[in-house]
Design a protein with these regions (language model features):
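Conserved NAD+-utilizing ADP-ribose enzyme module
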Residues: 1-20, 47-49, 63-64, 68-193
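Short aromatic-glycine-(Arg/Gly/Cys) micro-motifs in beta-strand/loop hairpins
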Residues: 20, 24-46
Length: 193
């Protein structure tokens, strides 16, 4: 009797997963502000990986972000509601970006936590003022991916969530190209959460 454990895996085919779908949760008013492109200066400074445009590979997480973003502050604005933005990015385009990736956020992962603590602890005007992650040669990383932080002071990450942040003009060009393409297969704003 043959068991599945010993069956060979099907052959991997390049191009099967040519497109990576990224999601961003925000409000309708925020999304309208991005219609001509994303402006990094509108991003908060002290996020997990510094100032950047944050996305996820999980639609449910983007929905959560959108609902959190749309809170009681916006109740008086009738024409506003939570939305998620969908970006379809070709993986080959992502490989052209200078990227930093973290798979795990274990308590002992010093590289991950030192970056998060540095970025989360940044405040405008202090010597730690920091826009995002920098390579050894002083260049900005275009993109950073890794777990979502629940409490950076206690080194706790959320299980089952991820984030990919974009930090530079070249990274923005990739996302803005999807927005301004006018093609719904590359970019879409969804309000049916």
């Amino acid at each position: 009797m043959k068991t599945a454990v010993f069956d060979p895996a099907p052959p991997w085919k390049a191009g099967r997963c040519e497109i990576l779908t990224l999601w961003h949760g925000c409000t309708r008013l925020d999304s309208e502000g991005m219609s001509a492109g994303i402006d990094l200066t509108r991003s908060r400074l002290n996020l997990d990986f510094g100032r950047g445009f944050y996305t996820t590979t999980l639609r449910r997480q983007a929905v959560h972000w959108a609902i959190r973003r749309f809170d009681s502050r916006f109740v008086s604005k009738i024409d506003n509601w939570p939305v998620v933005l969908r970006f379809a990015i070709r993986r080959v385009e992502l490989t052209e970006l200078k990227s930093l990736s973290f798979v795990l956020a274990g308590y002992q992962n010093e590289d991950y936590w030192s970056l998060v603590q540095h970025c989360r602890g940044s405040r405008p005007g202090n010597m730690n003022d920091h826009l995002g992650p920098v390579t050894d040669d002083g260049q900005w990383y275009d993109a950073v991916s890794g777990p979502v932080v629940a409490d950076w002071r206690q080194r706790a990450a959320l299980i089952g969530m991820d984030q990919i942040s974009f930090h530079t003009k070249s990274a923005m060009a990739l996302l803005n190209g999807a927005i301004t393409s006018g093609k719904t297969e590359r970019y879409e704003c969804q309000s049916n959460l």
